[in-house]
Every structure is written in C-alpha cells, then in structure tokens.
Design a protein with these regions (language model features):
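A positional/architectural concept
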Residues: 1-43
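Glycine-rich hexapeptide-repeat left-handed beta-helix
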Residues: 23, 29-31, 37-40, 44, ...
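Short proline/glycine- and basic residue-enriched helix-capping loop/turn segments at helix->loop/beta transitions
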Residues: 57
Length: 147
C-alpha cells in the first residue's frame, strides 16, 4: 500500500503486504529497488524523510523509519533502521539488526546486532556484485506479475 508523497524509480518493486507511508513526509526510492514482503517505510512529520538510492534490496519484514539508504546497500530481513540513520553505499545491515537513530553504517561494511555495531569491512566489488544481483533478481521477478 502506498500513501501520499512517495516516488519510486524505474524498475522498482514493492511486494505483498508492504506499506510506504508518505503521509507525514516524503519517501524517495531510487531505480531497481526492491522492498520485500511485509516491510514498512514511514517518516516523522517535519522531522525525517526516507531516501533510498539505486540497486537497493530491503528484505522481508524490514522497518525503515526516516533513514537514508545509499546505493547498492542491503537491508537484511527483519532489520529496523531508525530516524536519521545512514546506511552507506554497498553496506549490509545483517538480518534482525536494529540500526539506531543517527547511526552511520560505513560504506562497504557489515553491521549486525541489537543495537547494530560494526562487524567487518567487505570487499567493495564482492558486496556490489551480491547486492546488485539481488536487486536485479527482484527486478526480474517483478516482470512475472506484469500483464
């Protein structure tokens, strides 16, 4: 379900049971982004927006609340990313992680846990390859549902 001020780029897909709630503030989603089943994107009135770059995968049952997700990032299943957090380019938020408000997830790194903490750097090319593969696969899957 999509409400009010939401913009989704080319090749984007939102799967079953997702909610993009742009009634409080804007949500901008880049190209070839997939928001998987059960995820919620929400903002705070006059305080936070959501900005999602290109080639991003947002796993099942993720909550993103007023955060920035940069190009090529992967938000693992069941993660929570809170207001004013930034998930850097090619970064991974591991499944079940809680990225607290104002946390900066470094580009090309893995953060995990509750609260999410730095785990390790990943090879930038390997991360890009994995994250783009997932994003492009979901782009392909979405074509199966077009009439």
């Amino acid at each position: 379900k999509i409400r009010v001020d939401v913009n989704i780029g080319e090749g984007g897909s939102s799967w079953y049971g997702t909610m993009h709630s742009g009634d409080m503030n804007s949500i901008r989603i880049g190209n070839v982004v997939n928001v998987q089943d059960g995820s919620v994107l929400h903002t705070l009135y006059e305080k936070s927006t959501i900005e999602i770059g290109d080639d991003v995968s947002i796993g099942h049952n993720v909550t993103i609340h007023g955060a920035k997700i940069c190009n090529g990032a992967l938000i693992g299943m069941g993660s929570v990313v809170l207001d004013h957090a930034v998930v850097g380019e090619g970064a991974i938020s591991a499944a079940g992680s809680v990225v607290l408000s104002k946390t900066i997830v470094e580009p090309g790194s893995i953060y995990a846990g509750v609260p999410a903490k730095f785990v390790k750097k990943v090879d930038p090319e390997q991360a890009k390859e994995i994250n783009q593969k997932i994003a492009k696969n979901y782009h392909m899957y979405s074509s199966w549902y077009k009439e």
